[in-house]
Amino acid sequence: MAAFGIKSKIFQIMEMTILFLFAISIDRYCFAADEDMLQDVCVADLHSKVKVNGFPCKTNFTAADFSSFAISKPGATNNKFGSKVTTANVEQVPGLNTLGVSLARIDYAPGGINPPHTHPRASEMVFVMEGELDVGFITTANVLVSKQITKGEVFVFPRGLVHFQKNNGKIPAAVVSAFNSQLPGTQSIPITLFGASPTVPDDVLAQTFQINIEDVQQIKSKFAPAKKF
């Protein structure tokens, strides 16, 4: 009986330890989008052949690795969407590696749109520098949360939710976006579905959107994958 009691206590301790470790892991993922930094700086070696979740550290770095004019000028908006996203993430600012933050600038022509998209690795906060925008995100319960925002205003898009911005004004608009990830990633819904390479099967898209295959092919022609040379 004594031996049984000892074993029972051991199992109780093991259960408590497992639950404690599980709680820690849940807490970690609730508050962090990227892995925590383990050293003062880890400037990304963007040319390394080593593949890790992130980028390996460069041996030598300078102040230039922590600085960039990437978003200092408006982006060209003469395209099919009338908008341009210019990023300042770890790929432009190697010093952001392991820091869990990045920025982007988005410029919109009058009538321009940043079409529905998601950021799988980050939440986003936009600050309106010029103009006004109709913005919104859609919850997993298919509820649209939308608002018109103007110069000086901020708006938050939760991580992973589909969202958009549309300039319905008569003048250009611009925002700065902040992310809690060094590389938030972007999936544009129309481009992802109709411009993937290899292409998503026509019958899949036809049944999904309840349209015929000819319509699918017509839409795909507008989002043809870019040729790789």
UniProtKB/Swiss-Prot annotation:
Glycosylated. GO terms for cellular component: apoplast. Its cofactor is Mn(2+). Mn(2+) binds at H117, H119, E124, H163. GO terms for molecular function: manganese ion binding; superoxide dismutase activity. Residues 1-32 form the signal peptide. It catalyses: 2 superoxide + 2 H(+) = H2O2 + O2. It is found in: Secreted, Extracellular space, Apoplast. This is Nectarin-1. The lineage of its organism: Eukaryota, Viridiplantae, Streptophyta, Embryophyta, Tracheophyta. The gene is NEC1.
